[in-house]
């Protein structure tokens, strides 16, 4: 039986191409996740939005 958590990719909104990978519970978090996280390319905290892992 498959797990309840999906792997997702958090993509930087600064357009640098930097991303974090994490997982989320589909049942508890049905919408798209958004976090303020550190982007080392621009050296600032920027908004990261959920995207698909290819």
From Swiss-Prot:
InterPro entries: Ribosomal_bL33, Ribosomal_bL33_CS, Ribosomal_bL33_sf, Ribosomal_zn-bd. GO terms for molecular function: structural constituent of ribosome. Disulfide bonds: none annotated. Keywords: Ribonucleoprotein, Ribosomal protein. Pfam families: Ribosomal_L33 (PF00471). GO terms for biological process: translation. Gene3D superfamilies: Ribosomal protein L33. One of its GO terms (cellular component) is cytosolic large ribosomal subunit. SUPFAM superfamilies: Zn-binding ribosomal proteins. It comes from the Bacteria. Belongs to the bacterial ribosomal protein bL33 family. This is Large ribosomal subunit protein bL33. It comes from Stenotrophomonas maltophilia (strain K279a). The lineage of its organism: Bacteria, Pseudomonadati, Pseudomonadota, Gammaproteobacteria, Lysobacterales. The gene is rpmG.
């Amino acid at each position: 039986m498959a797990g309840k958590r999906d792997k997702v990719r958090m993509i930087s909104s600064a357009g640098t191409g930097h991303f974090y990978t994490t997982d989320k519970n589909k049942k508890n978090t049905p919408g798209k996740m958004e976090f303020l996280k550190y982007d080392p390319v621009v050296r600032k905290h920027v908004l990261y939005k959920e995207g698909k892992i290819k």
